[in-house]
């Protein structure tokens, strides 16, 4: 069983590597590669030739549909590459290349290939499933199965409704899942990653893929009138192109800031995985690709919760659905639409699925009272006013009392290679918050480092702190300090 799993992972990694290399080759150079293979390579490398043929066909198809700016997706490429590779033949005596392709009428494709890959001839067969008794039985089977899936969907909705009914039910559910992760995982890296995935998807009402695709270079500290400060990061790749994810102080066990702090201590930066033929718009993503499947498998096997026992039910993506339902129960339907990246509005440059089901405009930031409500520090009135649940527990006052860490070497040791990529002011706030909330901050004293020129900052002065950190260490290593939206790289 383990051997099969390892083989599958190895195959996926090889396919991703092949696609990345192929994507670097320009379209006209792809044609030259095809001619070179047909002229010089014997025996014929079918996989290699099929890959080049697939890429130029998909590129040409997108261009003919006036979708020149739309990239070739890796999943689409693999689907058609497999079909061509299985049926590819080459007759060197007549210089004829033949294969099957998913088209009703391949005549235009044949003419196009013969024009650009001259003097070779092409025979393209129509790839169709056989129309036999089995296909008809399968159609009936699918119709009946669809009816059962509707029943399954109703069951999923019922379970989500139960979890999202009250504050106690939703955060109690999250707490029990956190206990499960703590008890049933042995590796600290896995424990930290699962906890971040769980807590951040619930607190952000977001798809697990959105969290995974977060660009860690874009983390920034932003002010909030109800919570003091929070972290925000940009997600370049979503169903609609753009969105933010947020990490903010929370009153209960579920605290995305603490989860993020732990995760960054146990993991190194994860290079961005290439999913289209275009260069990635950013270098590092927050979570590794395989984590979502790993989490799904863990939860389905280890948890006794009814929602996780439903075949093909949501697991890594559950937080998005539950939190949306929870906000709706508290008369925040519109807020859930914006925060969760849902709507029926249409935008330019997004897929038809996205246009039909999703909308998110980056200029529309979620209202502060939404974070206040989810944090557990506040109750929200009908007029959207925020009232402290406990007057003695004021997050803004707590934020003012957080002693800021002034030793950059402490931060480098705490976050490892992440400290070379994530803006330093973000790590200053994150580490200071985590120490303070974990009661380490009460005993943590900021001492002047005269030898390095780093003073104490009793007023938590943000600009003074970052300027001092920069001045003290600029000669020792190159560090990017991000303050607001200005970047100073020395």
Swiss-Prot record:
This protein's record includes keyword Calcium: no
GO molecular function: DNA binding
Record keyword Ribosomal protein present: no
SUPFAM superfamilies per the UniProt record, alphabetical: DNA breaking-rejoining enzymes (SSF56349)
Active site: 358
Sorted UniProt keywords: DNA integration, DNA recombination, Plasmid
Tyr recombinase Flp-type domain mapped to chain residues: 152-437
InterPro entries referenced in this protein's UniProt entry, alphabetically: DNA_brk_join_enz, Integrase-like_cat_sf, Recombinase_Flp_C, Recombinase_Flp_N
GO biological process: DNA integration; DNA recombination
Family matches, as Gene3D superfamilies: Intergrase catalytic core
Function (record text): Catalyzes the recombination between the large inverted repetitions of the plasmid.
Family indicated by similarity: Belongs to the 'phage' integrase family.
Protein name: Recombinase Flp protein
Species of the source: Zygosaccharomyces rouxii
């Amino acid at each position: 069983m383990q051997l099969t799993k390892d083989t599958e992972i190895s195959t996926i990694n090889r396919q991703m590597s092949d696609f990345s290399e192929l994507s670097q080759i320009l379209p006209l150079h792809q044609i030259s590669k095809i001619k070179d293979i047909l002229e010089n390579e014997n025996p014929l490398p079918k996989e290699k030739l099929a890959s080049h043929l697939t890429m130029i066909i998909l590129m040409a198809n997108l261009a003919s549909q006036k979708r020149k700016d739309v990239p070739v997706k890796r999943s689409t490429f693999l689907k058609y590459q497999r079909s061509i590779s299985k049926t590819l033949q080459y007759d060197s005596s007549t210089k004829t290349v033949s294969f099957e392709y998913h088209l009703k009428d391949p005549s235009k494709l044949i003419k196009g290939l013969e024009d650009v890959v001259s003097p070779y001839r092409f025979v393209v067969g129509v790839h169709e499933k056989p129309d036999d008794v089995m296909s008809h039985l399968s159609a009936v089977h699918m119709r009946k199965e669809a009816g059962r899936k509707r029943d399954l969907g109703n069951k999923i909705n019922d379970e989500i409704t139960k979890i999202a009914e009250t504050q106690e039910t939703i955060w109690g559910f999250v707490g029990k899942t956190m206990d499960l992760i703590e008890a049933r995982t042995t590796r600290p890296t896995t424990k930290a990653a699962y906890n971040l995935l769980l807590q951040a998807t619930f607190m952000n009402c977001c798809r697990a893929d959105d969290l995974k695709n977060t660009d860690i270079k874009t983390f920034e500290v932003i002010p909030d009138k109800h919570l003091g400060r929070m972290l925000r990061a940009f997600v370049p790749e979503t169903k609609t192109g753009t969105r933010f994810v947020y990490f903010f102080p929370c009153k209960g066990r579920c605290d995305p800031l603490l989860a993020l702090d732990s995760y960054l201590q146990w993991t190194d930066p994860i290079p961005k995985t290439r999913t289209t033929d275009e260069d990635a718009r950013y270098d590092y993503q927050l979570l590794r690709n395989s984590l979502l499947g790993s989490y799904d498998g863990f939860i389905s096997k280890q948890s006794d919760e009814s929602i996780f026992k439903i075949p093909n039910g949501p697991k890594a993506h559950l937080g998005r659905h539950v939190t949306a339902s929870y906000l709706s129960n508290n008369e925040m339907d519109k807020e859930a639409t914006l925060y969760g990246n849902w709507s029926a509005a249409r935008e330019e440059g997004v897929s038809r699925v996205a246009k039909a089901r999703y909308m998110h405009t980056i200029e529309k930031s979620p209202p502060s009272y939404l974070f206040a409500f989810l944090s557990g520090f506040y109750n929200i009135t009908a007029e959207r006013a925020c009232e402290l649940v406990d007057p003695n527990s004021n997050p803004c006052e707590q934020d003012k009392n957080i002693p800021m860490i002034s030793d950059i070497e402490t931060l480098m040791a705490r976050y490892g290679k992440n400290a070379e990529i994530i803006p330093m002011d973000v790590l200053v706030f994150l580490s200071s918050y985590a120490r303070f909330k974990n009661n380490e901050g009460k005993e943590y004293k900021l001492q002047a480092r005269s030898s390095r020129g780093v003073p104490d900052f009793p007023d938590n002065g943000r600009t003074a702190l970052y300027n001092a950190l920069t001045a003290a260490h600029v000669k020792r290593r190159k560090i990017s300090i991000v303050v607001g939206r200005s970047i100073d790289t020395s």
